[in-house]
């Protein structure tokens, strides 16, 4: 499988995961917390990088650059998912207080303060509202971000032959 098709697959996975997030929000009625929003941005970043790589069809060094960008986007998302998993593991008396919604913060606070508040997480972020096979939503996003990092590493570290370049 060429790197171009790997990036295409990553884009489709990211688009599918974002569709699931919007389904959970608008159909199931789950309100996303600030860390959930940041994880969505991680998937958007990884998806955008992958779409650009798929459309560009890079060779050699270009694959490594796109692979690195994919790793950076997925790594940031994994860090945010890890933060939320940590908040969910805290005892009830150590959970931070609930904060305002993201929409409200965007209306009244500067962007930098919204980002700082979102990265800290709130009590909303510590609440487990849904599970599948024993994992909460940030658990599943951590699994998918880890998979994206592995695919980014694969694209970066694999050896490229002229035959691969012709199939891009």
From Swiss-Prot:
Q: From the UniProt record, which GO molecular function terms apply?
A: electron transfer activity; protein-disulfide reductase activity
One Gene Ontology cellular component annotation?
Answer: plasma membrane
Membrane topology (UniProt): Multi-pass membrane protein
Q: Where are the bilayer-spanning segments?
A: 7-23, 42-58, 66-82, 140-158
What are the boundaries of the signal sequence?
none
Keywords carried by this UniProt record = Cell inner membrane, Cell membrane, Chaperone, Disulfide bond, Electron transport, Membrane, Oxidoreductase, Redox-active center, Transmembrane, Transmembrane helix, Transport
User: Could you tell me the Gene Ontology terms of the biological process aspect for this record?
Assistant: protein folding
Q: What InterPro entries does the entry give?
A: DiS_bond_form_DsbB/BdbC, Disulphide_bond_form_DsbB, DsbB, DsbB-like_sf
- Which pairs of Cys residues are joined through disulfide bonds in the record? 33-36, 98-125
Superkingdom of the source species:
Bacteria
Which segments does the topology annotation call Periplasmic? 24-41, 83-139
Q: Which residues lie on this side of the membrane: Cytoplasmic?
A: 1-6, 59-65, 159-168
Write out the annotated subcellular location: Cell inner membrane
Which Pfam families does the entry mention? DsbB
**UniProt similarity note:** Belongs to the DsbB family.
State its role.
Required for disulfide bond formation in some periplasmic proteins. Acts by oxidizing the DsbA protein.
Q: What is this protein called?
A: Disulfide bond formation protein B
Q: Which organism is it from?
A: Marinobacter nauticus (strain ATCC 700491 / DSM 11845 / VT8)
């Amino acid at each position: 499988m060429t790197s171009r098709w790997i990036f295409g697959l990553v884009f489709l996975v990211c688009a599918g995961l974002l569709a699931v997030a919007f389904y959970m929000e608008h159909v199931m009625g789950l309100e996303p917390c600030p860390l959930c929003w940041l994880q969505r941005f991680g998937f958007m970043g990884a998806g955008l990088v992958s779409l650009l790589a798929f459309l560009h069809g890079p060779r050699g060094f270009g694959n490594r650059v796109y692979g690195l960008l994919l790793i950076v986007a997925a790594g940031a998302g994994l860090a945010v998912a890890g933060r939320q998993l940590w908040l969910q593991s805290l005892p009830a008396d150590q959970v931070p207080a609930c904060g305002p919604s993201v929409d409200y913060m965007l209306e009244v606070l500067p962007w930098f303060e919204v980002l700082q508040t979102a990265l800290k997480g709130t009590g909303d972020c510590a609440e487990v509202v849904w599970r599948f096979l024993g994992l909460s939503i940030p658990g599943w996003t951590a699994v998918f971000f880890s998979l994206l990092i592995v695919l980014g590493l694969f694209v970066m570290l694999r050896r490229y032959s002229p035959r691969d370049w012709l199939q891009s």
